[in-house]
Design a protein with these regions (language model features):
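Acidic, glycine/proline-rich low-complexity segments that act as flexible tails and inter-domain linkers
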Residues: 2-5, 13, 32
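Short, glycine-rich nucleotide/cofactor-binding loops
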Residues: 8-23, 46-52
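Histidine-anchored nucleotide/phosphate-binding helix
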Residues: 20-33
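Short internal beta-strands
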Residues: 27, 38-44, 71-77
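Short, basic, glycine/proline-bearing loop/turn elements
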Residues: 43-47, 86
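A glycine-rich helix N-cap at a beta->alpha junction
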Residues: 55-84
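A short aromatic-anchored loop/beta-hairpin motif
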Residues: 63-64, 72, 88-103, 109
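Aromatic- and Gly/Pro-rich donor/ligand-binding loops
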Residues: 112-114
Length: 114
């Protein structure tokens, strides 16, 4: 069932500036200022590699996890890119996202795609 207070951010753009100045900034502030009650960032494609390998991105993900932002990565992508273990060690949930994403879209859940 769709939760009108839960924002999902589908993060596919692996540019670090986009990550820091859009995805992360909005997600963190959305919880801080209570624009949304829940925020989940879905790591998809090359953003899995960026998250696993970029020290600054990893640090920011840790901070946001501690602040309540949820992170979940596409397992198929992470497996193919060889970064499943580093993502899990960071505290990121790693699951197959094809069906859940389809369900979110069919239920018209609030989703921001970057």
């Amino acid at each position: 069932m769709s939760d009108p207070d839960h924002l999902h951010i589908l993060w596919t753009n692996a540019d670090p500036v986009t990550a820091e100045k859009m995805v992360f900034m909005y997600a963190a502030n959305a919880l801080k200022f209570e624009w949304w009650k829940r925020v989940t960032i879905i790591i998809w494609g090359s953003t899995a590699t960026l998250t696993a390998e970029n020290a600054s991105i990893r640090s920011q993900v840790k901070e946001m996890l501690a602040g309540g932002v949820e992170f979940s990565a596409c397992k198929a992508c992470a497996d193919e890119l060889g970064v499943t273990a580093p993502l899990e060690e960071l505290g990121v949930e790693v699951i197959y996202w094809g069906e859940p994403l389809t369900r979110l879209l069919r239920e018209n859940c609030t989703m921001l795609s970057v």
